[in-house]
Structures are given as C-alpha cells and as structure tokens.
Design a protein with these regions (language model features):
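Active-site acid/base region of carbohydrate-active enzymes
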Residues: 1-4, 8-11, 23-86, 99-146, ...
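Generic, well-ordered alpha-helical scaffold segments in large soluble proteins
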Residues: 16-23, 40-43, 47, 91-98, ...
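Flexible loop/turn segments at secondary-structure boundaries
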Residues: 61-64, 182, 205-207, 277
Length: 290
C-alpha cells in the first residue's frame, strides 16, 4: 500500500537484484527485475519536491538506540527525510548501473541525471559547508559515506565524526537501516579497530549483549530483554528477527576478507582485516566457480 512505502524497505526493489547479480554474476535477474527497479525509483521521483524525497510515512532508522527519559536529547534520532534521500540516491545509482549493463543507454543517461540531482539536493539540504550533517548520528554518517553522497574532500572528516560519535557513546546506536553498513564504513575508512570494538562489546546495546543473556537468535531490539532478565515492556518485542544479523556480512567480507572482485566471484579478493582479539578465523565462500 502506497501509504506504507518506506525507505530502506521498499528499496529491496533495487538492492536485492543488484546483490544477486554481484553474488552470482547472472544478468537474468537484472533483466527480469529491471522494470520493477525503474518503477520504484520513478514512483519515488514522483513524490519529490526540488529533488528531495521528504513525503511519506517511512519507518526511519527503526528501533535505533534511545533513552527512555531523554531530557538532554541524547537519543540517536536521524530525521526520516535524510534517510529517505540517502536511499533514493542509492536506488537511482543501482538503476544507472543496471541500465548500463543491460545496454539501456537512454535510461542510463536519464537516471544518471536524476542521481546527480538527488545527490546535489542532499548536499544542499543536509550537509553544512564544513561537512557536518543535520543529524549528528552514527546512522547519518554511515549512510552518507556508504552511498558516496558526500564530496570526496569531506569524506575523511565525516568518517572521523562517525568515530567520534562511537567513542562519545561508547557503543553502537544504529537501528535497522544504519546497522548493516556501519562496520563496513568504519573499515573502509581505516577504522577497523573501532568496528571490532563494536562487534565485541558486551554491554547493552551490542551484538554480544543478547548472547550474554542466553540468546540463540537475533533480537529485534538491542534490549528486547533487560539486564534484570525481564522482557522489555514495549509492546513490540521480537526475539527472532533478522536486522542486526547483518553483521554477518561484515564478518565474511571484511573480517575474514572474502569479497567478489568481479560479479559472481569470477575474480575474488582475499584481504582479511585482523584484530588482536582473535588468534584465528575461518570462513569459506561458495561461488559459481567453486
């Protein structure tokens, strides 16, 4: 239903076909899904004003870290229009790449122009001349860096602000949309030590906190169970959810260092990012080539 269209969720229309292509190197998925990829970005484009996607009822950075009694504004709120613009630009970029692969030259030119306008609008609306973002959150810097939305000269500074934010809180604060990318962004910009600190933190909120509470599945919330063993009183509590399990992607691709250097792993790059906390690490990747 159009009233429930949400950035990040709806963008599976572009993200999944592209990831499938990168994993298997099979253009048929892109060929089959190309019409729906275009329909998604065309619809979002129809909802923009001045190239900004700010309409709608997006979920935002779902279940990000927040304080119950937030009198000093420390909850990690990333404004929803910011997130929407990030994913709008990202989906446009994926459609451009797909159009080029499929030989749709007119489409590629059309969506490339839209992508440039979306990025320019993002920078004008949400980035200060000094590279600060309107939402000073881990998710904001993560998405802006992951999707290459900042000018090259501002990216290193933004990565440093992301690290400063992590150090200021002492833990992760991202929700569903920032969590899949934060450790990758940190590693790409030379802060893999900070990514490992997030991975190995055992205090709430963290990946290892649920394990310390006996969890054998991924929770929907960082604090679905409280330290006293009581279930979170929030009406929406799931003890078997997918989102924060996205750290597994970073473990394979960055910690163990198994990445495709060409679609379908026709070429593979092996570059582990090591850490003193591990004496060994083992991983394997099944590909169309073995």
């Amino acid at each position: 239903h159009r009233s429930r269209i949400s950035a990040g969720w709806g963008d599976v229309a572009t993200i999944i076909p592209w990831q499938h292509y990168m994993a298997y190197g099979d253009l048929r998925m892109l060929e089959r899904q190309y019409p729906s990829m275009k329909k998604w970005v065309d619809y979002i484009t129809s909802q923009t004003e001045n190239d900004l996607w700010s309409k709608g009822n997006s979920y935002g950075d779902w279940v990000f870290f927040s304080y119950a009694d937030d009198k000093d504004g420390r909850s990690a709120v990333t404004i929803r229009p910011f997130i929407q613009q990030c994913f709008y630009a990202h989906s446009l970029d994926l459609v451009v790449r797909t159009a080029r692969l499929l030989g749709r030259t007119e489409d590629a030119a059309k969506y490339e122009a839209l992508h440039k306008r979306a990025v320019d609008a993002f920078r004008n609306e949400y980035v200060t001349p000094n590279g600060m973002l309107v939402s000073d959150t881990q998710t904001a810097y993560t998405l802006a860096l992951m999707f290459d939305l900042l000018p090259e000269a501002q990216r290193a500074g933004a990565a440093k602000r992301l690290v400063d934010n992590v150090n200021r809180y002492g833990h992760i604060t991202t929700g569903f949309l920032g969590t899949p990318y934060i450790c990758e962004v940190l590693t790409r910009f030379g802060y893999e030590d900070v990514a490992y600190e997030l991975l190995l933190n055992k205090k709430i909120p963290s990946w290892l906190y649920p394990i310390s509470m006996g969890a054998t599945t991924i929770w929907e919330r960082w604090n679905s169970m409280l330290p006293n063993g009581m279930v979170n009183s929030n009406s929406m509590v799931s003890f078997n959810h997918y989102a924060y399990g996205a750290i597994g992607d970073w473990l394979y691709r960055w910690a163990a260092g198994l990445q495709e250097a060409a679609p379908g792993f026709r070429e593979i790059r092996i570059k582990p990012y090591l850490n003193d906390h591990f004496t060994s690490m083992k991983a394997e990747q099944r590909t169309p080539y073995g």
